[in-house]
């Protein structure tokens, strides 16, 4: 799958744009250290944007009927994404909770795969959080879903306000976790517990 996406980008166009960008900032793209930079950067972006054109919901290929009606939480799913405003990375961890409906559960790795697909594109953290929750709701129709994403944004660290170490936390809730503050708080406390 990765190889397929890497080959689907317009490699020549991406390399030409990076070459022109180097010229625009006053660099010589033909000097020794930069000779292969357009090719390397185009390849890197192809990898970083592997999620483009994919639906995170499609990652939920394994759905099982189990006798489990209590909350399922997967914490600390590491991810890297790219801020669509500045095209610099933001990275962090996603925490996902869902309350199965009729015992419908998914393979735990499928949650991590959905995060991977949703994060591998120019993205906003708020949208990333919602896309993960929506994919889970569409795939499993759980009684409740809660997604929390914590991330450090290089656009706040490297430029502008320059506040390294600051984290942005976004949450989104669906179903029972949206309707019941007490249920939501209980799940958040489990997500944030070490």
UniProtKB/Swiss-Prot annotation:
Pfam families: GTP_cyclohydroI
Assembly and binders: Toroid-shaped homodecamer, composed of two pentamers of five dimers.
GO CC aspect terms: cytoplasm
UniProt name for this protein: GTP cyclohydrolase 1
Catalyzed chemical reaction(s): GTP + H2O = 7,8-dihydroneopterin 3'-triphosphate + formate + H(+)
Gene3D superfamilies registered for this protein in UniProt: 1.10.286.10, 3.30.1130.10
PROSITE patterns xref list: GTP_CYCLOHYDROL_1_1, GTP_CYCLOHYDROL_1_2
SUPFAM superfamilies from the UniProt entry: Tetrahydrobiopterin biosynthesis enzymes-like
Organism of this sequence: Streptococcus pyogenes serotype M3 (strain ATCC BAA-595 / MGAS315)
GO aspect biological process, one term: tetrahydrobiopterin biosynthetic process
Family matches, as PANTHER family: GTP CYCLOHYDROLASE 1, GTP CYCLOHYDROLASE I
